UniProtKB/Swiss-Prot annotation:
InterPro entries: YaaA. This is UPF0246 protein FN1762. GO terms for cellular component: cytosol. Belongs to the UPF0246 family.
Length: 248
């Protein structure tokens, strides 16, 4: 089973695995990443402000990081990303078995790196899929390469589990790759709706559960009960597993 996951805007330059015996890996799309960095590095600070809608210290730091990209520290992807979903991962408590599961099963989609394995060495960045820095847009820049890569690493009949946000799962070509979507909804007065902050946390908790319990098939997935969420069979179908809970 392979799992796709979203990156986060929040990042840190801290490698929590520095003193562990882990084999770090190289990003698969370094050439394409360098193309994007080259494009960004030619932009003025005013152009970066307009493209990224940033101001003040965040703008200055982002511009500085772009100009000094070569000097930035390499951090494994799973340690670098530090947003809401990633904070639900109990990384420092993971056993050797859990770390191996992460290494073998997780793919983090990204605007700058395409698709990264958990222990690929990356550098911090700021870039969204909707930002216009290439003629055809970032979705088109990445789509073929990411789909070819995922198709190649999936074994025959292996599941691709979608724990990514819609912004990033749109990268996947459903005609080329069969995917099981996981979604989380809150029930209130008989209606169901997705609430962004809850969904982000739930995706992180769900991934954490998969890793710690070495989940490898759909039969195990539909039995998961987590943080009040259960599979909702009325809302789910063979390609979309909807987990719901009552909003108290």
């Amino acid at each position: 089973m392979k799992i796709i996951f979203s990156p986060s805007k929040e990042m840190r330059e801290e490698n929590i695995f520095e003193n562990k015996k882990i084999e770090f890996t190289e990003s698969k799309f370094k050439d394409k990443t360098n193309i994007l960095i080259k494009i960004l590095s030619k932009k003025s600070i005013n152009e970066i402000e307009n493209i990224m809608k940033l101001k003040g210290e965040l703008l200055n730091n982002t511009y500085k990081d772009i100009q000094n990209y070569d000097k930035l520290k390499y951090i494994p992807a799973i340690s670098m990303y530090y947003g809401v979903s990633f904070k639900e991962l109990e990384l420092e408590d993971y056993s050797e078995k859990s770390l191996k599961y992460l290494k073998n099963n997780l793919l983090i989609l990204s605007t700058l790196y395409g698709a990264s394995l958990a222990f690929d060495l990356l550098k911090k960045y700021r870039l969204d899929m909707t930002m216009s820095i290439t003629d055809k847009g970032l979705y088109n820049f990445w789509k073929k390469d990411v789909n070819d890569y995922i198709s190649n690493i999936l074994n025959k009949d292996e599941i691709l589990l979608n724990l990514a946000s819609s912004e990033f799962s749109k990268l996947i070509d459903n005609k080329k790759i069969s995917m099981i979507n996981i979604d989380f909804k809150e029930e209130e007065d008989g209606t169901y709706k997705s609430i962004s902050i809850y969904s982000k946390k739930a995706r992180g908790k769900f991934l954490n559960y998969l890793v710690k319990n070495q989940v490898s098939n759909l039969e195990e997935i539909i039995k998961i009960e987590l943080d009040g969420y259960n599979i909702n069979k009325d809302l789910s179908d063979e390609k979309n597993f909807i987990f719901t809970r009552k909003n108290s």
